[in-house]
Amino acid sequence: IDGTTNFLYNLSGYAISIAACIGAEPIAAAVFLPATRELFVAAQGHGAWLGSNPLRVSSCESLDTALIGTGFSYSSARREAQGQRISRLLPQVRDIRRCGAAAADLCFVACGRLDAYFEEGLQPWDLAAGQLIASEAGAQISNFSGEPITPSEVLVSTPGIHSSLVASL
């Protein structure tokens, strides 16, 4: 379960996230959102799907029209740094949302409900399924510096705003 705090408090923002990996690389993924009964799936090289509908990221090309998702750490020191990052980013984007489940947010980028998602301090199991689904839907994925993704820094977005987000984060 991703979004365990939401689950414990009976909030709808949680997901069941499963990935099959070879080494650290996800090759098949499924994310189920119980609140909406939506099932997102992907297989490496075969695309991403919501039910029978193929997924594509949004066509957003400007930060000022971008809806961005993020999450917050349980560490107060890390949350303070995250708050500073968000205060710098807020004037540049349409708005920022926090769902509480990284797997769901990654799927929301994949289907175009969000234009980007960033977070720090995730665990590999938070990331594996949603990362593959977003990638197969055409998302660009990196850390905050534009380098290969790690669970400690995750940036997933439409290709049209990725470099602007790297510069802003």
Regions found by a protein language model. Name each.
Residues 84-91, 104-169:
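Oxyanion/phosphate-interacting regions
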Residues 9, 78-79, 120:
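Glycine/threonine-rich flexible loop motifs
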Residues 16, 20, 130-133:
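Buried hydrophobic packing segments
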Residues 4, 33, 134:
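Conserved G/P- and acidic residue-centered "switch" motifs that form tight phosphate/ATP-binding loops
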Residues 1-14:
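Glycine/serine-rich anion-binding loops at beta->alpha junctions
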Residues 17-106, 153-169:
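Acidic beta-strand-loop-alpha-helix segment within the catalytic core
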